[in-house]
Amino acid sequence: MDYSYLNSYDSCVAAMEASAYGDFGACSQPGGFQYSPLRPAFPAAGPPCPALGSSNCALGALRDHQPAPYSAVPYKFFPEPSGLHEKRKQRRIRTTFTSAQLKELERVFAETHYPDIYTREELALKIDLTEARVQVWFQNRRAKFRKQERAATAKGAAGATGAKKGEARCSSEDDDSKESTCSHTPDSTASLPPPPPAPSLASPLLSPSPLPAALGSGPGPQPLKGALWAGVAGGGGGGPGTGAAELLKAWQPAEPGPGPFSGVLSSFHRKPGPALKTNLF
């Protein structure tokens, strides 16, 4: 074999420095080297170059034999995150129970809320379900039962509280109604009309002139006026009651007739003593 080209290293380096990567046209390879990542790692060699005496041809051959990066990496080498999302989106199909299955499940649940494995397997074979589905149904049914119990307890407590509040409100209303009834009940004494004031005889009896003028229409003992007033002033020889009685008898007309003070004189004639005593003295 010919190893003479090994001694031409110095000349090749000198030629490379002189050309400064100038022209690769001297090489028998196709003109213009183009890099492509899809090129095979070891492309087929072109026509053989002459011995490495030519520096341009040797440099082109070295660059042509470099492997392309990622040329052997297959497409979609790394897994995409969409695959994980697809797995997460997979959901179990919801089990639909028939009326016969629900009837059997409710019957067993009424007997026990926590059936053992044997009871669940027997029930699953009977209603054509898996034991896992039966177990999940009992778990959901127990949760629903507890929720119903809590709701019933809360409703009962609310009803008891409302009843207590209603009783307290009724008692307060009863008290208020009693107070209002007592306050608005009319008093028996207040409902009665006030008694008429007792007529005072001091002014008509002690004044000598107005009384005869008022009684002038009817007959009266006019000649005895001075004697009667003198008897009243002096006591009439007896007590004050005797003088008052004599006065009334003297002033009473001989024949009954209508007069303005006939009713008053008749009432005082029935009760002559205390009233005249209080009014006159």
Curated annotation (Swiss-Prot):
DNA-binding region boundaries: 90-149
Region Disordered, annotated ranges: 145-219
Compositional bias annotation for Low complexity: 153-163, 200-216
Pfam families, alphabetized: Homeodomain
Record has Endoplasmic reticulum as a keyword: no
Main location: nucleus
Annotated GO biological process: locus ceruleus development; midbrain development; noradrenergic neuron differentiation; oculomotor nerve formation; parasympathetic nervous system development; positive regulation of transcription by RNA polymerase II; regulation of respiratory gaseous exchange; regulation of transcription by RNA polymerase II
One annotated Gene Ontology cellular component of this protein: nucleus
Keywords, comma-separated and alphabetical: Activator, DNA-binding, Homeobox, Nucleus, Transcription, Transcription regulation
Protein name (record): Paired mesoderm homeobox protein 2A
Lineage: Eukaryota, Metazoa, Chordata, Craniata, Vertebrata
